[in-house]
């Protein structure tokens, strides 16, 4: 099945997914919210700003400027903006989306103003539009270079999830499906916060024992929040949670981990953000998850500790001491 796909968001991840769709045989148009970035992609037929390893776009992938005026051309819209821009993008789509069109989200995080799940935002604004989430352990550069990658497509509508699965999957990119859109979102969002925590620990040279403990207890915190919201327990040992958590906490391709690493090495927050020189989702998501967990009365010690380091200037060494000397308890 050949489809016409609009990709909104031309960062590394949005571009990698646009490339995957083009390699799959679809006609793809990609848009950046920055006019000068669109002009560069149109002129050079690449996105060297975010994916310098890709010399030229394949023939089926091109940049587009005025996507609203051309919305009728597309079957599906892939939203790959930072979480901070997700709500505004959905509001823009509300003004022009057609009844037969559907949305795929590749954005991870929570809504920055209401701390709601992104699927809730989409359903509230576009209640009759089919919505799916694509998430899992996937670095953009590796996907763009067609290295083997596996992800999850989550939707309340299993038939729509299967449609998206077929849209993307080929010999390099394998999509699984699930109807647990809550669990998939919680895993994909919270892991970015924990990747910062892992980076801080690495920067302070706390060792691999601490790294293993952090991932394991971090997974327990994600699961606790997810179950409170109605997620399925099995989701948390799958690609959208454990898989993504392992990847993001363990490799310096992760912007979130690198940001934490710089903090652990003594940089200020502003210095670390400047050094990463790209969106650090976990920095913004930490505040959202903190407020979200407090709202739902869910205790998340590692997430709360990371929030205090990022937003209350807490000393990481003091935080570690507090975490290690909390009241002793049963693991489960």
From Swiss-Prot:
One of its GO terms (cellular component) is cytosol. Its EC number is 1.1.1.94. It is found in: Cytoplasm. The keyword Magnesium does not apply. Sn-glycerol 3-phosphate binds at residues 108, 136, 138, 191, 244, 254-256. Pathway: Membrane lipid metabolism; glycerophospholipid metabolism. HAMAP family: NAD_Glyc3P_dehydrog (MF_00394). Belongs to the NAD-dependent glycerol-3-phosphate dehydrogenase family. This is Glycerol-3-phosphate dehydrogenase [NAD(P)+]. The gene is gpsA.
């Amino acid at each position: 099945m050949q489809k016409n796909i609009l990709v909104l968001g031309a960062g590394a991840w949005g571009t990698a997914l646009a490339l995957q769709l083009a390699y799959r045989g679809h006609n793809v148009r990609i848009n950046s919210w920055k006019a000068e970035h669109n002009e560069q992609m149109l002129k050079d037929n690449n996105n060297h700003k975010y994916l310098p390893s890709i010399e030229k776009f394949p023939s089926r992938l091109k940049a587009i400027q005025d996507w609203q005026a051309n919305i009728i051309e597309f079957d599906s819209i892939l939203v790959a903006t930072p979480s901070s821009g997700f709500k505004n993008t959905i509001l823009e789509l509300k003004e022009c989306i057609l009844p037969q069109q559907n949305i795929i989200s590749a954005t991870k995080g929570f809504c920055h103003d209401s701390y709601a799940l992104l699927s809730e935002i989409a359903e509230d604004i576009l209640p009759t539009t089919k919505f799916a989430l694509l998430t899992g352990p996937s670095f953009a550069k590796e996907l763009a270079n067609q290295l083997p990658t596996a992800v999850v497509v989550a939707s309340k509508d299993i038939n729509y999830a299967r449609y998206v699965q077929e849209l993307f999957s080929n010999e390099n990119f394998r999509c699984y499906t699930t109807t647990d859109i809550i669990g998939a979102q919680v895993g994909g969002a919270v892991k970015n916060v924990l990747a910062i925590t892992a980076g801080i620990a690495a920067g302070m040279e706390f060792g691999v024992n601490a790294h293993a403990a952090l991932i394991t207890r971090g997974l327990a915190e994600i699961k606790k929040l997810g179950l409170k919201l109605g997620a399925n327990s099995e989701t948390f040992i799958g690609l959208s949670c454990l898989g993504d958590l392992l990847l993001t906490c363990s490799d310096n391709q992760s912007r979130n981990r690198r940001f934490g690493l710089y903090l652990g090495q003594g940089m200020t927050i502003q210095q670390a953000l400047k050094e990463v020189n790209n969106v650090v989702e976990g920095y913004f998501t930490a505040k959202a998850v903190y407020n979200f967990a407090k709202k739902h009365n869910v205790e998340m010690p590692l997430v709360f500790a990371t929030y205090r380091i990022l937003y209350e200037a807490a000393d990481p060494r003091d935080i570690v001491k507090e975490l290690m000397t909390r009241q002793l308890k049963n693991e489960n």
